[in-house]
């Protein structure tokens, strides 16, 4: 009787049970040492003693995917958006030197579609596998009075750990350090309100628009999942003393690079030292944006930046290449006299 009354209120309990059954196989493949408990427990559990850290510091992060979700909904493609959610969280805690341990997701929707929910969680599990994190819990909330039937929101939460003496904070970066950039896959998960405005409001392009500059239709380019840098960067952290790490997200270079600096330091970024992806040139063209504006908003083809001592540059590049990464020397840290970010050859 209670179930029937709940159904009349617009909440499909049976669909929720179907989701749990469908996602079990995806959750199972994210298991790692330290993860405890089973799917359906009230709380997710992790055994920190499995890490063998002398002074463990826990580092947590939470994030969502923003309005990139609207493109996934419109294109009816939901199997990679979960990777974005994981990436936004784990890349952030990686910037402190932390290894992601576990992840939890939260999906809110107007109507529970078990197939769609499975696709979303599959993406989350894919991201967790890439990051080496266990998917130890989550929540799917059906709220018909809050969301349209096809709408959903996705958020994630991660916790990682690092040995206290290896925790990366802004005080470690020094003048003379070299900046090494690791490529992005594209826009990643920031700036999509502007992206959608440029392509679909200010210009009447279609989702499947073909641009000669792109090797895939527009929507495929825009939905390319955010790269997860955990495994290659953790290998670098084992090999050299990394002074600072920046995850280039919302606010682009201008807002994010200073986050690893003290107030007396600046970074000089040499434009042209890495290939800018074609999607950014298209947005600059059709959005009529200046070059500086682009670097204030987007990652411009670099998703993560490491600051290392000059004597560690060669080893850092070597480790990244050994782990399948392209990497570029993109600038240096200097003493600050004015702006925190200086662009060599920047155009207005």
Swiss-Prot record:
Record keywords, A-Z: ATP-binding, Cytoplasm, Ligase, Nucleotide-binding, Purine biosynthesis
InterPro entries registered for this protein in UniProt: PurM-like_C_dom, PurM-like_C_sf, PurM-like_N, PurM-like_N_sf, PurM_cligase
Highest taxon listed in the record's lineage: Bacteria
Pfam families: AIRS (PF00586), AIRS_C (PF02769)
Subcellular location: Cytoplasm
GO cellular component annotations of the record: cytosol
GO molecular function: ATP binding; phosphoribosylamine-glycine ligase activity; phosphoribosylformylglycinamidine cyclo-ligase activity
Entry's EC annotation: 6.3.3.1
GO biological process: 'de novo' IMP biosynthetic process; adenine biosynthetic process
Biochemical pathway: Purine metabolism; IMP biosynthesis via de novo pathway; 5-amino-1-(5-phospho-D-ribosyl)imidazole from N(2)-formyl-N(1)-(5-phospho-D-ribosyl)glycinamide: step 2/2
Principal location: cytoplasm
Enzyme class: ligase
Family per record: Belongs to the AIR synthase family.
PANTHER family recorded: TRIFUNCTIONAL PURINE BIOSYNTHETIC PROTEIN ADENOSINE-3 (PTHR10520:SF12), TRIFUNCTIONAL PURINE BIOSYNTHETIC PROTEIN ADENOSINE-3-RELATED (PTHR10520)
Name listed for the protein in its UniProt record: Phosphoribosylformylglycinamidine cyclo-ligase
Organism, scientific name: Listeria innocua serovar 6a (strain ATCC BAA-680 / CLIP 11262)
Gene name of the encoded protein: purM
């Amino acid at each position: 009787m209670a179930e029937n009354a709940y159904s009349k209120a617009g909440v499909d309990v049976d669909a929720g049970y179907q989701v749990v059954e469908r996602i079990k196989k995806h959750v199972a493949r994210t298991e790692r040492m330290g993860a405890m408990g089973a799917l359906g427990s009230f709380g997710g559990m992790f055994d920190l003693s499995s890490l063998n850290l002398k002074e463990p510091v826990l580092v947590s992060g939470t994030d969502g995917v923003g309005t990139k979700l609207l493109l996934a909904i419109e294109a009816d493609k939901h199997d990679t958006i979960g990777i974005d959610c994981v990436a936004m969280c784990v890349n952030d805690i990686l910037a402190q030197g932390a290894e992601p341990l576990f992840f939890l997701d939260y999906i809110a929707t107007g109507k529970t579609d078990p197939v769609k929910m499975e696709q979303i969680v599959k993406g989350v599990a894919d991201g967790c596998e890439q990051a080496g994190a266990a998917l130890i819990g989550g929540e799917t909330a059906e709220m018909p009075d809050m969301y349209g039937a096809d709408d959903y929101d996705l958020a994630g939460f991660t916790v990682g750990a690092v040995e206290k003496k290896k925790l990366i904070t802004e005080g470690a970066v020094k003048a003379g350090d070299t900046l090494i950039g690791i490529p992005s896959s594209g826009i990643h998960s920031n700036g999509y309100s502007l992206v959608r405005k440029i392509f679909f409001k200010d210009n009447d392009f279609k989702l499947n628009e073909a641009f000669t500059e792109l090797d895939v239709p527009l929507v495929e380019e825009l939905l390319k999942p955010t790269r997860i840098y955990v495994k290659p960067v953790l290998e670098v952290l084992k090999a050299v003393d990394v002074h600072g790490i920046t995850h280039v997200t919302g606010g682009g270079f201008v807002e994010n690079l200073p986050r690893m600096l003290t107030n007396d330091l600046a970074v000089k970024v040499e434009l042209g030292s890495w290939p800018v992806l074609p999607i950014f040139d298209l947005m600059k063209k059709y959005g009529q944006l200046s070059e500086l504006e682009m670097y204030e908003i987007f990652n411009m083809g670099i998703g993560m930046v490491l600051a290392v001592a000059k004597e560690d540059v060669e080893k850092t590049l070597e480790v990244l290449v050994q782990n399948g990464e392209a990497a570029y020397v993109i600038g240096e840290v200097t003493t600050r006299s004015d702006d925190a970010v200086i662009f060599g050859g920047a155009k207005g």
